[in-house]
C-alpha cells in the first residue's frame, strides 16, 4: 500500500480539487494511519481499528472527486459504492455483503496484475519464442527446444535476426496464425435476492467445467504479442498464492467509499414505514463494526476495513441516521460551498481544468482558444450567480456555463480552423449576459 505522508497526499489532491482542506487532511491522515498500523508490533496491531469518516457537504464541492483521486493514491483495494443501490435483506436489490465481495474482487485483480508485472520480462521472452517458432519452424527432426537453444547453428542465426527485427517492431504488421487459449464461456445466472453468493459459486463451477479449448487465430504480430504475453504471464502466476494475499490485503488495507449515505437516512418528520432505508442502515452496522463475510475466495473479516461515507444532507441531517451507525463514523468533516475565487481556481489551477480540456479538444481542429484572466473571472462570477439564484450544484455548474459559452465555436470549429478565439470578459458577456441577468433561468438548470 501507499507510504505517502499526509502532506504528500494533500499536495496530490490539491492538483485536482480546490479547497476543502479539512476533508483532504482527514482522508490523508486516515490513509497514513493504514501504513502506520502495519509498522506496529503484531500484538497491538489487531487492536488498532480504523476511524471511519463521514463527509458532509453540498453537491459538486469535491466529495466524490476526493474518493476517485484517493483510489489512485491508495495503492490498496478500494471500492466506491452508492448507498441507494442497496436494500434490506429480503427486498429486491443488492444486499450490503456484496460490497465486501466486490472489494475482494478488486483486491484479487490488483494482486494478480502486480504479480503479472513481476514476471512480465519472462513472459515476453516466452511469447517471443512462440512467435519465432511460427516464423521459423524448427528443422525437421529437431525439437522446438533444440531450435530455441541454437542447435543446429543455422536456425540459431535466423532466430537471432528475426528476434532483433521483432524487438525493433519491423514485423509488427506481418500476419501470423497462432494457437491461443479460447475464452471460457460466461454463464449468466439470475440470482434471487440474498442469494448472490450461491449464484457466484454456481457461475464459478460452470465456468470450470470442460477442458481448456485452444484455437488458431490469424493476427498481426503486434496484437499476437500482447495476447501471448498475457497468456504466458498467467501461466507463471500462482493463483492460490494470489487469492491468499488478496484476501489479506482486502482485510488489512481495504477502503470502502459509500456515497449518497444521506439518501438512506429517514427524516424524523417524514411518515411511512421506510423499512428499506432503515434496513440498509441496520445491515451496514455489522459491516462497519466488524463482521465476517463469505466470498468465493474465502472468509473476509471487515474489522480493519476503512469506511468513508459521504452525503449532501440537504433533506436529511446526519442525526437522522440511526444512532448506532452515527457512532461508527467518529470523524466528521464538513465541506464548504464554492466561492467565486474557488471557481476561478478550478478553471485555472487544477491539473486537468475545463479550460485545458476545451483548448485541447478544439486544438484538434486547428482552433486556438485563448482565455484571458478577465474572461475567466467573469465566467466564475456567472457560474456563482446562477448557483446562488437557482439550485447550487457546485463545480458542475461550470460545465453547463462552458458548454453554453463555447457552443458557437464548437459548432463552427472546422470553418474557424487556423484562427485564434480570444475569450475575454466581453466575449463572455455577449454570450452569457442573458444567463446572468434573466431571473427565469429554468431552462439552463441541469
Swiss-Prot record:
Q: Which GO terms describe its biological process?
A: protein unfolding; proteolysis involved in protein catabolic process
State the compartments where it is located: Cytoplasm
Q: Which GO terms describe its molecular function?
A: ATP binding; ATP hydrolysis activity; peptidase activity; proteasome-activating activity
Q: How does it assemble?
A: A double ring-shaped homohexamer of HslV is capped on each side by a ring-shaped HslU homohexamer. The assembly of the HslU/HslV complex is dependent on binding of ATP.
Q: What does this protein do?
A: ATPase subunit of a proteasome-like degradation complex; this subunit has chaperone activity. The binding of ATP and its subsequent hydrolysis by HslU are essential for unfolding of protein substrates subsequently hydrolyzed by HslV. HslU recognizes the N-terminal part of its protein substrates and unfolds these before they are guided to HslV for hydrolysis.
Gene3D superfamilies in the record: 1.10.8.60, DNA helicase RuvA subunit, C-terminal domain (1.10.8.10), P-loop containing nucleotide triphosphate hydrolases (3.40.50.300)
Listed binding positions for ATP are: 18, 60-65, 259, 324, 396
The UniProt family comment states: Belongs to the ClpX chaperone family. HslU subfamily.
Which species is this UniProt entry from?
Acidovorax ebreus (strain TPSY) (Diaphorobacter sp. (strain TPSY))
**Major localisation:** cytoplasm
Query: What is the protein name stated in its UniProt record?
Result: ATP-dependent protease ATPase subunit HslU
Q: Which GO terms describe its cellular component?
A: HslUV protease complex
The UniProt keywords, alphabetically, are:
ATP-binding, Chaperone, Cytoplasm, Nucleotide-binding, Stress response
Supply the PANTHER family for this chain.
ATP-DEPENDENT CLP PROTEASE ATP-BINDING SUBUNIT CLPX-LIKE, MITOCHONDRIAL-RELATED (PTHR48102), ATP-DEPENDENT PROTEASE ATPASE SUBUNIT HSLU (PTHR48102:SF3)
Amino acid at each position: 500500500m501507499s507510504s505517502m505522508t499526509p502532506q504528500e497526499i494533500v499536495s496530490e489532491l490539491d492538483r485536482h480539487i480546490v479547497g476543502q482542506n479539512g476533508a483532504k487532511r482527514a482522508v490523508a491522515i486516515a490513509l497514513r494511519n493504514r501504513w502506520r498500523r502495519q509498522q506496529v508490533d503484531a500484538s497491538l496491531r489487531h487492536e488498532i481499528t480504523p476511524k471511519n469518516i463521514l463527509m458532509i457537504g453540498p453537491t459538486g464541492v469535491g466529495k466524490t472527486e476526493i474518493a476517485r483521486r484517493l483510489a489512485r493514491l491508495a495503492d490498496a483495494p478500494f471500492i466506491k459504492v452508492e448507498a441507494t443501490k442497496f436494500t434490506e435483506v429480503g427486498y429486491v436489490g443488492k444486499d450490503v455483503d456484496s460490497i465486501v465481495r466486490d472489494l475482494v474482487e478488486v483486491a484479487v485483480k490488483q494482486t494478480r496484475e502486480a504479480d503479472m508485472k513481476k514476471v512480465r520480462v519472462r513472459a515476453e521472452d516466452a511469447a517471443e519464442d512462440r512467435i519465432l517458432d511460427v516464423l521459423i519452424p524448427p528443422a525437421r527432426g529437431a525439437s522446438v527446444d533444440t531450435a530455441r537453444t541454437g542447435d543446429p547453428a543455422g536456425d540459431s542465426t535466423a532466430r537471432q535476426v528475426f528476434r532483433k527485427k521483432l524487438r525493433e517492431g519491423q514485423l509488427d504488421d506481418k500476419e501470423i496464425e497462432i494457437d491461443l487459449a479460447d475464452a471460457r464461456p460466461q454463464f449468466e445466472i439470475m440470482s434471487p435476492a440474498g442469494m448472490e453468493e450461491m449464484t457466484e459459486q454456481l457461475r464459478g463451477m460452470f465456468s470450470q467445467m470442460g477442458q481448456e479449448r485452444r484455437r488458431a487465430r490469424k493476427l498481426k504480430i503486434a496484437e499476437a504479442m500482447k495476447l501471448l504475453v498475457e497468456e504466458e504471464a498467467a501461466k507463471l502466476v500462482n493463483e492460490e498464492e494470489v487469492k491468499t494475499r488478496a484476501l489479506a490485503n482486502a482485510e488489512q488495507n481495504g477502503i470502502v467509499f459509500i456515497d449518497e449515505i444521506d439518501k438512506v437516512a429517514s427524516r424524523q418528520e417524514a411518515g411511512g414505514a421506510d423499512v428499506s432505508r432503515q434496513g440498509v442502515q441496520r445491515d451496514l452496522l455489522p459491516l462497519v463494526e466488524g463482521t465476517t463475510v463469505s466470498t468465493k475466495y474465502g472468509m473476509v473479516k471487515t474489522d480493519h476495513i476503512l469506511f468513508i461515507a459521504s452525503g449532501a444532507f440537504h433533506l436529511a441531517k446526519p442525526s437522522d441516521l440511526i444512532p448506532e451507525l452515527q457512532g461508527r463514523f467518529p470523524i466528521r468533516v464538513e465541506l464548504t460551498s464554492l466561492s467565486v475565487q474557488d471557481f476561478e481556481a478550478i478553471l485555472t489551477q487544477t491539473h486537468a481544468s475545463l479550460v485545458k480540456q476545451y483548448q485541447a479538444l478544439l486544438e484538434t481542429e486547428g482552433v486556438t482558444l485563448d482565455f484571458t484572466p478577465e474572461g475567466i473571472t467573469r465566467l466564475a462570477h456567472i457560474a456563482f450567480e446562477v448557483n446562488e439564484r437557482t439550485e447550487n450544484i457546485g463545480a458542475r455548474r461550470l460545465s453547463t456555463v462552458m458548454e453554453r459559452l463555447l457552443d458557437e465555436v464548437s459548432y463552427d470549429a472546422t470553418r474557424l480552423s487556423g484562427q485564434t478565439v480570444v475569450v475575454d470578459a466581453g466575449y463572455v458577456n455577449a454570450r452569457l449576459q442573458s444567463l446572468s441577468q434573466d431571473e427565469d433561468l429554468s431552462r439552463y438548470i441541469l
